[in-house]
Regions:
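Short, solvent-exposed loop/turn segments at secondary-structure boundaries
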Residues: 16-19, 159
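Nucleotide-sugar donor-binding and catalytic loop/hinge architecture
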Residues: 1-4
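Nucleotide-sugar donor-binding patch of glycosyltransferase catalytic domains
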Residues: 61-62, 93-182
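A short, flexible beta-alpha/helix-coil linker loop
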Residues: 10-13, 152-153
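Donor-binding and catalytic core of enzymes assembling or modifying cell-surface/extracellular glycoconjugates
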Residues: 10, 19-109, 115
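A generic structural signal for short coil/turn motifs at secondary-structure boundaries
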Residues: 13-16, 146
Length: 182
């Protein structure tokens, strides 16, 4: 069965989509006729996310279950990457996967995924940015992209992630998947 990867974590808490938004997005994704494989490592951040995942149909939790090599293979087999600004996003970009990336305070011009198709990365900060096979979501508030490690610049919460609607992310994924199935 076809599947997408949902990678809800990142190395730092200030880059992680809030739990309520993550859950809402997963509920929407589980309603699509496609498998959703949740990935992550076995570190403290990912384990905390794993312990709070909702039980949903079509959703398969592999957090802490794959090596990096196995993740590369899993990513290669997937149709798309949905998730945070992290190494896994860049792996998917290198594999020419369809990407739906959620960014917090990170500077897109420096850290956005590379589109092999267009031979470029993001060139400006925008709430929704499409280029090649990549869609990036980032809040439309004055402080974005501050580049700080959270609003306190000490690895705390990034309020900008609360401004990215799970419904908006889902709508982009649904539109893409509807066209893939045609």
């Amino acid at each position: 069965k076809d599947f997408v990867i949902f990678h809800p974590s990142a190395q730092y808490n200030y880059k992680i989509y809030p739990q309520h938004s993550r859950h809402e997005l997963l509920v929407h994704l589980s309603d699509l006729d496609i498998g959703v494989v949740i990935t992550g490592s076995n570190n403290q951040i990912d384990t905390a996310i794993k312990n709070k995942l909702p039980a949903l149909s079509n959703v398969f939790d592999l957090i802490g279950e794959t090596t990096l090599e196995e993740y590369f293979a899993l990513s290669e087999l997937s149709l798309a990457y949905i998730g945070m600004d992290t190494l896994n996003m860049h792996i998917a970009a290198a594999q020419n996967k369809r990407i739906f990336a959620i960014f917090g305070p990170t500077n897109l011009r420096m850290w956005s995924p590379w589109s092999n198709q267009l031979q470029k990365s993001a060139t400006e900060d925008m709430p929704i940015q499409n280029y090649g096979n990549i869609t990036i979501f980032q809040a439309n508030i004055p402080c974005v992209a501050c580049g700080n490690a959270g609003c306190d610049n000490e690895h705390g919460k990034s309020e900008c992630l609360d401004h990215i609607s799970p419904q908006m992310v889902f709508n982009e994924v649904k539109n893409w998947y509807t066209n893939v199935r045609l």
